[in-house]
């Protein structure tokens, strides 16, 4: 300022004075203009009066800068050496101050920054006598730029806030164009975080478009979701991946999108790979994008195809539980690979009945083959305490018919072959045993009755003991422990010198049969994958029928002693193969041996298979069983949730044995003799055995396709018809016309009867015993069911001859037929279908821990650890 301080003083007296007052007039004009603008004309007149009465030639240019209104805007502060108070000017107009010329109350102090000691200037003395204190120095160019930048940023922030308010109302471009951007009520709703307001604004379009979210709106909602763990409510409104990692990936995509077009492009790409929608129409549109047909020209045809896929009854599939955390993968590529073939290419419906079958897709997203038969949709299921229970049982991509599972099934099935041989032994052996020309000791009819009836009684004892054995020794070790006693029992019979040794051998064999019949289905149920559990689970029954057939054929050529020696040789290969297979992974988990369980699963599923998801499911299931278990397991059987599956298993065992099957098997030769058939009795038994064997293999092909209940229906109807026809034949033979020319009829009825029994009621009760019984009571409940089965077997075989004596053969067959008729209604009303379901799914359904999705739509989800 020193260069401009005394522009009027540089000349001589009058000239200099005149030159100095011209800038004063200019400055006074500026002052008047500014003070008048703020409504303070009185202050101006006071300044003018003071100047006119003063005797000074000092120019105001020595005091004022050219533009004193560029001072930065700061909050006003009191000068430490001044008591002058100022009047605030407009926010965008910096004030002006004349400290020596104005009165204290005229105007307020200017909003300048407080001066430091160094910044304070000494009073200036001009040519006059009045001392003037100068104003602070003018702002630098840097301060001016900062001031203007702050103003620009404030304006930009205000514009962005207005833009966000507009964008929050825009769900799509169409809906945004139809709305009034100046609607203040809509702006208030956009700022609201209330769920009802959110639903009201978004429900009209949110689930109807494949890319139906605005750039900023979904980002805001994603932040809300990640902060509050409120994923379920968000999932019902917006199209976001079910896994946390996918949601974070979407958030990154949104942040990186620099324009709306780029946002829609990345959004479509993301949805095409990870989209999970509760609205099937949305996902179907995404399917079109994946398949390269994103145009709407064929929309009507697409809608018709979609309805056919969604609502066709044959496309009903089974529910499965999904663990959201387990769906996370190490990389986006892994995620894409593991999910694209079974998760992204079809609709997710809140009602499992409307979920369509999965399609096997190629890399381009096109349908490559037939429907994947065993694929399952992902449906949330709820536990009995009302909280979501999330477990993982994804459709496996591991090979199913691998040799290790087949080897395990064949190994235990050889034990079933021994069981079948031992069970059928009395039918051909008693014929030669009662012959004194062959046997060195006398076998009375009463003793012969006990030879046939003691084995079921011993099976009852073995069934009771088998429950604790499989729990404490393990499934495999229990089965293995029966091999040597089978050999010993057959040797006792083969070397018998009296009836007592025969009875002892039969009792020991029956005890082992009771244990084996309990442990074999449990072992297979816990080792074989659900997709083939029905097929491989029937192998023990098929091999049991082979044992029966082998006994009948060998009995035609051997006496009872040689037949027993053959029975002693059969357990040897069974004993060798049992050493090659592992214990069940489920039993290892129940004993806390996680590493052993992992090795067993790797052996059963293959070394290249991913067994971790299945192992986690087993561990969670065992943890639930441990939390709910009690010390007294037998008391657990009486609980309502456990008694239901147990009663179904007992009912199946009851109707299996009361169909009369064991009476027919044990007394086949005698029945054909009484019927007066022209066919040799031994030949008839061989024919019955062959039919029994073939029918079981037919059942193995049908059980995983037709289901358990369908085969039970067919089995019941076939047995009802043949038993009533047999009863009519024997009634006519005893009381009616001559039926000797119908000697073929008993054999035909027996063949159809055995065929029907072997299709359903023969193998399925044992298979379902290992499926429907809960894990925590499986050992004790299977023990009770097995003991009950052998009790019924003992009653039927021991009383069959007495029934014939009392009511005749026709009465006995009619009684069995009536029981089968009742059993048909039992199957219809109470027996569940277990085809293709995991043991955990079956257990939840049997124990009543599954609810419909519609009944739990408002249940708060589990928290996510992120």
From Swiss-Prot:
What GO CC terms are in its UniProt record?
Answer: plasma membrane
Instruction: Tell me the InterPro entries matching this sequence.
Output: MFS_dom (IPR020846), MFS_ERD6/Tret1-like (IPR044775), MFS_sugar_transport-like (IPR005828), MFS_trans_sf (IPR036259), MFS_Trehalose_Transporter (IPR050549), Sugar/inositol_transpt (IPR003663), Sugar_transporter_CS (IPR005829)
- Per UniProt, the ranges with Basic and acidic residues bias are 143-152
The record lists the membrane-crossing segments as: 400-420, 450-470, 483-503, 507-527, 534-554, 562-582, 652-672, 683-703, 710-730, 750-770, 777-797, 811-831
User: How is this protein positioned relative to the membrane?
Assistant: Multi-pass membrane protein
Which residues, renumbered to this chain, are glycosylated? 437
Where are the residues of the annotated region Disordered? 1-34, 67-212, 282-311, 335-357
Q: Where does it primarily localize? A: membrane
Q: Which residues lie on this side of the membrane: Extracellular?
A: 421-449, 504-506, 555-561, 673-682, 731-749, 798-810
Q: Name one GO biological process term.
A: trehalose transport
Q: Which Pfam families match?
A: Sugar_tr
Cytoplasmic compartment segments: 1-399, 471-482, 528-533, 583-651, 704-709, 771-776, 832-866
- Compartments in which it is found: Cell membrane
Residue ranges, compositional bias (Low complexity): 110-133
Q: Which UniProt keywords apply?
A: Cell membrane, Glycoprotein, Membrane, Phosphoprotein, Sugar transport, Transmembrane, Transmembrane helix, Transport
Q: Residues where Phosphoserine occurs?
A: 257-259, 329, 331, 854-855
Which residue stretches does the UniProt record annotate as biased composition, category Polar residues? 74-86, 340-350
Q: What family is this protein classified in?
A: Belongs to the major facilitator superfamily. Sugar transporter (TC 2.A.1.1) family. Trehalose transporter subfamily.
Function (record text): Low-capacity facilitative transporter for trehalose. Does not transport maltose, sucrose or lactose. Mediates the bidirectional transfer of trehalose. Responsible for the transport of trehalose synthesized in the fat body and the incorporation of trehalose into other tissues that require a carbon source, thereby regulating trehalose levels in the hemolymph.
Q: What is this protein called?
A: Facilitated trehalose transporter Tret1
Q: Which organism is it from?
A: Drosophila ananassae (Fruit fly)
Upper classification of the organism: Eukaryota, Metazoa, Ecdysozoa, Arthropoda, Hexapoda
Q: Which gene encodes it?
A: Tret1
């Amino acid at each position: 300022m020193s260069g401009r301080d005394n522009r009027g003083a540089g000349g001589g007296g009058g000239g200099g004075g005149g030159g100095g007052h011209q800038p004063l007039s200019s400055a006074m004009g500026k002052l008047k203009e500014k003070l008048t603008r703020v409504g303070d004309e009185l202050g101006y007149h006071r300044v003018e009066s003071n100047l006119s009465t003063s005797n000074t030639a000092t120019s105001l240019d020595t005091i004022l800068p050219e533009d004193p209104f560029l001072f930065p805007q700061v909050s006003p502060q009191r000068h430490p050496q001044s008591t002058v108070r100022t009047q605030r000017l407009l926010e965008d107009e910096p004030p002006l101050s004349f400290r020596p010329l104005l009165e204290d109350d005229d105007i307020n102090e200017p909003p300048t920054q407080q001066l430091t000691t160094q910044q304070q200037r000494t009073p200036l003395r001009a040519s006059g006598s009045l001392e003037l204190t100068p104003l602070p120095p003018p702002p630098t160019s840097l301060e001016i730029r900062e001031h203007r930048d702050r103003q620009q940023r404030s304006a930009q922030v205000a514009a962005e806030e207005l833009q966000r308010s507009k964008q929050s109302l825009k769900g799509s471009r169409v809906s945004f164009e139809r709305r009034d951007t100046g609607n203040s009520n809509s702006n208030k709703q956009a700022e609201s975080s209330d769920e009802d307001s959110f639903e009201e604004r978004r429900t009209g379009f949110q689930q109807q478009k494949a890319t139906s979210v605005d750039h900023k709106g979904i980002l805001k909602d994603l932040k809300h979701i990640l902060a509050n763990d409120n994923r379920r409510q968000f999932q019902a409104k917006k199209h976001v991946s079910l896994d946390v990692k996918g949601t974070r990936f979407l958030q990154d995509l949104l942040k990186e999108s620099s324009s709306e077009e780029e946002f829609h492009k990345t959004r479509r790409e993301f949805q095409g790979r990870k989209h999970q929608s509760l609205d099937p129409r949305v996902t179907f549109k995404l399917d079109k994008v994946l398949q390269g047909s994103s145009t709407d020209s064929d929309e009507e045809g697409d809608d018709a195809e979609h309805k056919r896929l969604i609502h066709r009854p044959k496309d009903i599939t089974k529910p499965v539980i999904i663990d959201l955390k387990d769906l996370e993968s190490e990389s986006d590529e892994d995620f894409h690979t593991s999910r694209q073939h079974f998760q992204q290419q079809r609709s997710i419906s809140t009602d499992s009945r409307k979920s369509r079958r999965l399609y096997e897709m190629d890399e381009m997203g096109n349908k490559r083959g037939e429907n994947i038969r065993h694929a399952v949709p992902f449906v949330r299921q709820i536990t009995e305490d009302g909280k979501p229970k999330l477990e993982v049982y994804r459709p496996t991509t591991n090979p199913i018919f691998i040799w290790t599972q087949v080897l395990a099934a064949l190994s235990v099935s050889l034990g079933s072959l021994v069981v079948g041989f031992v069970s059928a032994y009395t039918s051909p052996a008693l014929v030669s045993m009662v012959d004194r020309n062959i046997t060195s000791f006398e076998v009375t009819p009463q003793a012969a009755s006990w030879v046939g009836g003691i084995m079921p009684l011993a099976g009852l004892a073995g069934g009771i003991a088998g429950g604790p054995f499989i729990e404490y020794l393990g499934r495999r070790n229990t089965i293995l422990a029966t091999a040597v006693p089978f050999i010993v029992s057959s040797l006792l019979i083969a070397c018998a010198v009296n009836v007592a040794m025969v009875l002892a051998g039969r009792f020991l064999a029956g005890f082992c049969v009771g244990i084996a019949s309990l442990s074999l289905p449990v072992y297979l149920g816990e080792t074989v994958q659900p997709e083939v559990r029905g097929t491989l689970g029937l192998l023990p029954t098929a091999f049991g029928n082979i044992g029966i057939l082998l006994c009948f054929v060998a009995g035609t050529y051997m006496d009872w002693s040689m037949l027993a020696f053959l029975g002693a040789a059969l357990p040897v290969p069974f004993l060798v193969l049992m050493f090659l297979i592992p214990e069940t992974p489920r039993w290892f988990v129940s004993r806390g041996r996680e590493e052993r369980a992992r090795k067993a699963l790797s052996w059963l599923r293959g070394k290249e298979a991913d067994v971790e998801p299945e192992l986690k499911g087993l561990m969670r299931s065992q943890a639930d069983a441990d939390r709910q278990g009690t010390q007294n397991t037998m008391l657990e059987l009486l609980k309502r949730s456990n008694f239901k599956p147990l009663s179904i298993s007992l009912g199946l065992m009851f109707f299996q044995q009361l169909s009369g099957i064991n009476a027919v098997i044990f007394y086949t030769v005698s029945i054909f003799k009484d019927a007066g058939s022209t066919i040799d009795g031994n030949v008839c038994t061989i024919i019955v055995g062959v039919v029994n064997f073939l029918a079981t293999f037919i059942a193995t092909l049908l059980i995983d396709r037709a289901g358990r209940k369908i085969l039970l229906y067919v089995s019941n109807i076939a047995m009802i018809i043949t038993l009533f026809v047999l009863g009519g034949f024997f009634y006519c033979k005893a009381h009616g016309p001559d039926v000797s020319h119908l000697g073929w009829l008993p054999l035909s009825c027996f063949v159809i009867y055995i065929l029907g029994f072997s299709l359903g009621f023969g193998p399925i009760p044992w298979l379902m015993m290992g499926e429907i019984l809960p894990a925590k009571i499986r050992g004790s409940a299977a023990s009770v069911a097995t003991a009950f089965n052998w009790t019924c077997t003992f009653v039927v075989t021991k009383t069959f001859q007495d029934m014939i004596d009392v009511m005749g053969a026709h009465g006995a067959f009619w009684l069995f037929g009536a029981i089968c008729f009742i059993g048909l209604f039992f199957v219809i009303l109470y027996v569940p279908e277990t085809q293709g379901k995991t043991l955990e799914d079956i257990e939840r359904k049997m124990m009543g821990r599954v609810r419909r999705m519609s009944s739990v739509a408002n249940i708060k989800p589990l928290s996510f650890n992120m």
